[in-house]
């Protein structure tokens, strides 16, 4: 019995020891952060696992428990089925599906410590919340001490490579692990990781050995600031080996990603301590669209310095590419290429190439700087410079523009080298040296300024010594607008040339060579409101002109205004009566070297009573026009202070009808707008009055509905006439856009018109009829045509007609006809036509049927390749002196780099309505020695 008791007690003692031993093998359930707190099954499934990558040195370390080193070496790969992610349930079907693994390694900045038993032990607590199988190969390296993070691998059923991450692909779902994996080392399901920043409602955790949470927060803040300086580093490869604290080697389809930087190669090494990366075999570096490829790479992720051997490169912003013997990384977005090439042509097309001994690309400023540059076009060297600076983004920058070449019959061969100075974002300057074989050297300057309340432009050209005339010749043009505040604004205009033939000798377009009066003016204006809807304006100006005379067709020099003060005031609905009151007036002192001088005072008060509703209006108006002259003694006139007073009465009325209609399957709104305008002005003899500024206006719809057919204030017509006008418009119902407008007008005078500009005055009683059509006849054909007829003789007095055919961008045909009886008779045809993706022609012919000569002729051809364009244009221009000049333009444009030769684009855009530039969308600036 005693023996049985002793035996039973022994068995109980043995069982107690075994139970204690088993108890010792379980993780303790204390509050210490080393063990963590297990969450009951089912709780926290919806709560995210927060990982503080800042405090975790290796996301793929795990504690191997009691496994021996030999057990760790027993397997080199991990089956995807053995991975258990938090909050995932087991999938029995997944156990029998092996997959080829790819090892991943994630690095982030570590917190350095002096002790392996202190903070290092704490950091090991923050491993990724993932349960891993035990059969993992231990990588070569020093044995990990207790608490020190060790490298571990991660496998996925469908590995999401870093390149897939860059493309934004969603990761494939990983099969759920078997339930047998639940007791393996790792964090429990739904467990919060100690040390992350606590959000509202999070349970506060303390690191081992720490008692004050404030100290924890301070350490976390310091660690977070350190992490901000360097993005986490992710490494993916077929096989990883090495040690987290030292060097990691990735073998087979290796990929490294750190922020926007992405590197891939066949083989790669990464040292976390120094942040150095080395890669060999099919190296590819990507950053924000830039792609660099080479054979060997050495790169520091922190300093962004290193080198890439035998690289090819493609820049996203510039759409450029090239090759080099060596590429040096010299900091963030700074590349230096040695023995390099540069082009914007696509791969396989080297139509033009910059061959450079040393090329530096500043990817922040988008500027390239090259040394010892040779430019080849179609394998033919066309330019060499020891130094070049260019923008590959199209933005403004200081530097030399590409030289321009050209030829003209009056200037000879030309070469111009312009320099652009980008002084500030709101003002710049361009200086150009222009060498002409027949004229010598010309210096051209342009300055532009744009301020918040002002803007300016200055042109200054000089030929120090014209080889033809042996004189100094020059031109200046300046304008400035300025808002002074409080309703005041000012404008200055000054234009002058050294002689009357300057534009004929140096101009290259008809508008320039036919200029006759160059404006010189200073203006000060004051504007304010009168009540809610009234206006008040006072203007003062000083004005004169430089008149460029044609020896074969002399013109009268305009009067100078020294000065002129004008007043305009308008007040609608005065005192709520519905009456609109208007007052206009001026005082002007006119000066002329050969004609009558004097001053003129003009006052024109008027009142109108507009009546309007939804379908029409009627507006009676009455005014009194008063004019007084002070001609002074010796003016050669019969009266020194003549005056004129004229009452003016008008009645304007109109109706508006509309209807819905369908035309060609489209829905339109058609309007019908009849209008009747009557004006009465009694006759007053005006022969004794000087004519300072009056001229006859061109007959048009606007002039038909005006009270005076003369401009200025010296001549006021006698009138007792009525104008009938009818307008119909076709509006798109969906957008309200006007598709077509038709209008006819007839002016009927009840008296003989006795006031004319001629002396002696003649009677003019001819009734006038006008018709006009404008808009789109079809989606591709538009017109703007007007006719004025003499109904007595059934002859056209004025014809203006223009038709344009534009089926698509780059294809346009224009035809124009202009006729004014006894004045001009011209035809004008122009075209830009793209025959293929690359070839197009341009042409213009402006011919005078009255003079039987070509006013302007132009013909050219353009070839647009994908990365370069070539333009050749011939221009024949008739000058105001009945002489002519011929110019040739030849330009080679290298897309994204420069334009070489004389630029015909300004001539083409002015001469051919609807011309659009095809090929390059801009060229850069170059800067030379």
Swiss-Prot record:
<dbReference type="InterPro" id="IPR020889">
    <property type="entry name" value="LipoPS_assembly_LptD"/>
</dbReference>
<keyword id="KW-0998">Cell outer membrane</keyword>
<dbReference type="GO" id="GO:0015920">
    <property type="term" value="P:lipopolysaccharide transport"/>
</dbReference>
<dbReference type="Pfam" id="PF04453">
    <property type="entry name" value="LptD"/>
</dbReference>
<keyword id="KW-0732">Signal</keyword>
<comment type="subunit">
    <text>Component of the lipopolysaccharide transport and assembly complex. Interacts with LptE and LptA.</text>
</comment>
<dbReference type="GO" id="GO:1990351">
    <property type="term" value="C:transporter complex"/>
</dbReference>
<keyword id="KW-0472">Membrane</keyword>
<feature type="signal peptide">
    <location>
        <begin position="1"/>
        <end position="24"/>
    </location>
</feature>
<dbReference type="InterPro" id="IPR007543">
    <property type="entry name" value="LptD_C"/>
</dbReference>
<dbReference type="InterPro" id="IPR050218">
    <property type="entry name" value="LptD"/>
</dbReference>
<feature type="compositionally biased region" description="Basic and acidic residues">
    <location>
        <begin position="181"/>
        <end position="208"/>
    </location>
</feature>
<dbReference type="GO" id="GO:0009279">
    <property type="term" value="C:cell outer membrane"/>
</dbReference>
<protein>
    <recommendedName>
        <fullName>LPS-assembly protein LptD</fullName>
    </recommendedName>
</protein>
<feature type="compositionally biased region" description="Polar residues">
    <location>
        <begin position="154"/>
        <end position="164"/>
    </location>
</feature>
<dbReference type="GO" id="GO:0043165">
    <property type="term" value="P:Gram-negative-bacterium-type cell outer membrane assembly"/>
</dbReference>
<comment type="function">
    <text>Together with LptE, is involved in the assembly of lipopolysaccharide (LPS) at the surface of the outer membrane.</text>
</comment>
<feature type="compositionally biased region" description="Basic and acidic residues">
    <location>
        <begin position="44"/>
        <end position="74"/>
    </location>
</feature>
<feature type="region of interest" description="Disordered">
    <location>
        <begin position="26"/>
        <end position="208"/>
    </location>
</feature>
<comment type="similarity">
    <text>Belongs to the LptD family.</text>
</comment>
């Amino acid at each position: 019995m005693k023996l049985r008791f002793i035996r039973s007690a022994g068995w109980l003692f043995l069982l107690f020891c075994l139970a204690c031993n088993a108890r010792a093998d379980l993780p303790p359930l204390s509050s210490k952060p080393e063990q963590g707190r297990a969450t009951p099954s089912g709780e926290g499934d919806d709560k995210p696992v927060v990982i503080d990558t800042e405090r975790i040195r290796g996301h793929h370390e795990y504690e191997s428990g009691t496994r021996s080193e030999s057990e760790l070496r027993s397997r080199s790969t991990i089956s995807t089925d053995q991975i258990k992610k938090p909050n995932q349930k087991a999938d029995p079907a997944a156990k029998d599906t092996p997959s080829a693994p790819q090892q991943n390694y994630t690095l982030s900045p570590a917190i350095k410590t002096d002790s392996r038993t202190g903070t290092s032990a704490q950091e090991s607590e923050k491993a990724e919340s993932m349960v891993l199988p035990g059969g993992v190969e231990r990588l070569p390296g020093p044995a990990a001490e207790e608490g020190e993070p060790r490298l571990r691998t991660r496998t996925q059923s469908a590995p999401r490579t870093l390149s897939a991450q860059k493309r934004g692909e969603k990761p494939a779902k990983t099969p759920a692990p078997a339930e047998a994996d639940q007791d393996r080392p790792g964090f429990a399901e739904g467990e919060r990781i100690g040390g992350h920043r606590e959000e509202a409602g999070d349970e506060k955790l303390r690191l081992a050995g720490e008692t004050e949470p404030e100290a924890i927060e301070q350490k976390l803040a310091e660690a977070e600031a350190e992490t901000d300086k360097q993005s986490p580093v992710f490494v993916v490869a077929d096989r990883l080996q090495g040690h987290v604290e030292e060097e990691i080697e990735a073998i087979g389809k290796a990929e490294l990603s750190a922020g926007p930087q992405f590197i891939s190669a066949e083989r790669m090494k990464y040292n976390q301590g120094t942040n150095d990366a080395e890669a060999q075999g099919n190296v590819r570096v990507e950053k924000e669209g830039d792609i660099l490829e080479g054979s060997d790479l050495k790169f520091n992720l922190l300093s962004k310095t290193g080198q890439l051997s035998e690289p090819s490169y493609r820049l996203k912003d510039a759409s450029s590419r090239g090759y080099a013997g060596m590429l040096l990384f010299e900091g963030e977005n700074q590349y230096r290429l040695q023995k390099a090439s540069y082009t914007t042509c696509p791969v396989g097309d080297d139509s033009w190439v910059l061959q450079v001994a040393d090329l530096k690309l500043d990817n922040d400023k988008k500027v390239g700087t090259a040394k010892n540059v040779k430019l080849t076009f179609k394998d033919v060297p066309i330019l060499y410079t020891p130094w070049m600076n260019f923008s590959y983004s199209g933005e403004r920058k200081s530097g030399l523009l590409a030289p321009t070449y050209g030829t003209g019959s009056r200037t000879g061969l030309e070469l111009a080298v312009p320099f652009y100075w980008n002084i500030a974002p709101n003002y710049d300057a361009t200086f150009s040296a222009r060498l002409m074989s027949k004229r010598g050297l010309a210096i051209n300057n342009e300055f532009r300024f744009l301020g918040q309340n002002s803007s300016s432009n200055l042109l200054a050209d000089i030929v120090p010594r014209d080889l033809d005339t042996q004189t100094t010749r020059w031109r200046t043009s300046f304008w400035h607008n300025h808002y002074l505040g409080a309703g005041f604004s000012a404008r200055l205009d000054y234009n002058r040339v050294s002689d009357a033939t300057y534009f004929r000798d140096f101009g290259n377009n008809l508008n320039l060579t036919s200029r006759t009066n160059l404006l010189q003016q200073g203006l000060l204006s004051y504007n304010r409101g009168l009540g809610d809807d009234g206006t008040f304006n006072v203007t003062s100006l000083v004005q004169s002109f430089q008149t460029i005379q044609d020896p074969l067709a002399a013109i009268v020099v305009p009067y100078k205004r020294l000065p002129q003060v004008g007043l305009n005031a308008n007040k609608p609905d005065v005192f709520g009566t519905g009456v609109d009151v208007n007052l206009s007036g001026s005082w002007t002192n006119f000066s002329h070297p050969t004609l009558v001088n004097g001053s003129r005072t003009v006052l024109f008060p008027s009142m109108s009573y507009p009546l309007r509703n939804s379908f029409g209006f009627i507006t009676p108006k009455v005014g009194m026009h008063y004019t007084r002259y002070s001609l002074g003694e010796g003016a050669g006139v019969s009266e020194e202070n003549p005056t004129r007073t004229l009452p003016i009465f008008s009645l304007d009325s109109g109706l508006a009808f509309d209807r819905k209609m369908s035309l060609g399957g489209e829905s339109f709104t058609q309007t019908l707008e009849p209008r009747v305008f009557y004006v009465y002005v009694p006759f007053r003899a005006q022969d004794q009055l000087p004519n300072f500024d009056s001229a006859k206006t061109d007959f048009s719809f606007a002039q038909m509905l005006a009270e005076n057919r003369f401009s200025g204030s010296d001549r006021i017509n006698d009138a007792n006439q009525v104008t009938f006008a009818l307008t119909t418009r076709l509006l798109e119902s969906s957008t309200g856009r006007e598709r077509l407008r038709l209008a006819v007008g007839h002016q009927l005078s009840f008296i003989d018109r006795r006031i004319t500009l001629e002396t002696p005055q003649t009677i003019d009683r001819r009734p006038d009829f006008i018709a006009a059509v404008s808009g789109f006849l079809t989606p591709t054909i538009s017109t703007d045509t007007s006719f004025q007829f003499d109904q007595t003789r059934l002859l056209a007095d004025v014809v203006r007609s223009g038709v344009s055919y534009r089926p698509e961008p780059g294809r346009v045909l224009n035809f124009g006809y202009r006729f004014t009886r006894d004045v001009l008779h011209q035809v004008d045809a122009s075209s830009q036509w793209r025959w293929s993706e690359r070839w197009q022609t341009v042409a213009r012919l402006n011919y005078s049927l009255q003079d039987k000569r070509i006013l302007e002729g132009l013909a050219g051809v353009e070839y647009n390749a994908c990365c370069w364009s070539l333009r050749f244009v011939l221009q024949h221009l008739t000058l105001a002196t009945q002489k002519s000049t011929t110019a040739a333009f030849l330009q080679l444009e290298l897309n994204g780099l420069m334009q070489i030769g004389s630029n015909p684009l300004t001539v083409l855009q002015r001469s051919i309505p609807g011309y659009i530039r095809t090929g390059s969308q801009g060229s850069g600036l170059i800067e030379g020695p």
